[in-house]
């Protein structure tokens, strides 16, 4: 399917907008002036080895058609701003046309091309080539002088506008691509930060679990410090030698405690007998 370009020809009355358009489409010059309200023309052509379809809208230059012109401007992709080199007034009008385009398109950058028409009327020139070029530079767009009568730079003007549209679209696409890449980079950076934060949280959680496990192990092993001191709750009841064996199983500790109980009972009995003997000696009496 052919790429279609919607071109709008804008300028004051009598500058040769229709003559330029008809010369491009039909390759002949219209000598008489017939004020245009709206004419649309289509032409298939080859530009830079690409088959394209030009949809050219020739608009009215009269001020009374300003509202209608705004409607045409909304649909246009690119604009030919045409003045006549033998009319200073038509040259000065281009500023208002350009401002109207920017306002309607709601943009500060629109594909346009400034055309100084009727360059065959050199003896009647009122606008110098340098002034036309300076105006185009202020619009940041190309500039050509044309002659619809002598078919000078007619195709170049329309084709140049198409190239300007392509350059404009390429810049827009590049800007959108860069913006998308920046957004992707920001998302990647944010994802990396989230992963790093999650990793730190996991490490902290593992560390806390390890501390809790160590505390639980100490409680199970009798609550004894490294020097064999029983904890404040009196748990454990084991000697310092047992405290140095934190990895003993519970059954082993019970066996050791059972072995110590008979020995402790014998010691208690011996201590009781000794105390009874002492009391007998101290409690004897003498009969007189």
Curated annotation (Swiss-Prot):
Give the lineage. Eukaryota, Fungi, Dikarya, Ascomycota, Saccharomycotina
Q: Which organism is it from?
A: Candida albicans (strain WO-1) (Yeast)
**Lipid modification (S-farnesyl cysteine), residues:** 285
Q: Which residues form a coiled coil?
A: none
Q: Where is this region: Disordered?
A: 176-288
Q: Which GO terms describe its cellular component?
A: plasma membrane
Lipid-linked residues (S-palmitoyl cysteine): 284
Q: Which family does it belong to?
A: Belongs to the small GTPase superfamily. Ras family.
Q: What is this protein called?
A: Ras-like protein 1
Record's catalysed reaction(s): GTP + H2O = GDP + phosphate + H(+)
EC number(s) stated in the UniProt entry for this protein: 3.6.5.2
Activity control: Alternates between an inactive form bound to GDP and an active form bound to GTP. Activated by a guanine nucleotide-exchange factor (GEF) and inactivated by a GTPase-activating protein (GAP).
Task: Identify the coding gene.
Answer: RAS1
Q: Which InterPro entries match?
A: P-loop_NTPase, Small_GTP-bd, Small_GTPase, Small_GTPase_Ras-type
Where is the motif (Effector region)?
33-41
- What is the documented function of this protein? Required for the regulation of both a MAP kinase signaling pathway and a cAMP signaling pathway. The activation of these pathways contributes to the pathogenicity of the cells through the induction of the morphological transition from the yeast to the polarized filamentous form.
- Biological process terms in GO annotation: signal transduction
Low complexity biased stretches = 178-216, 246-281
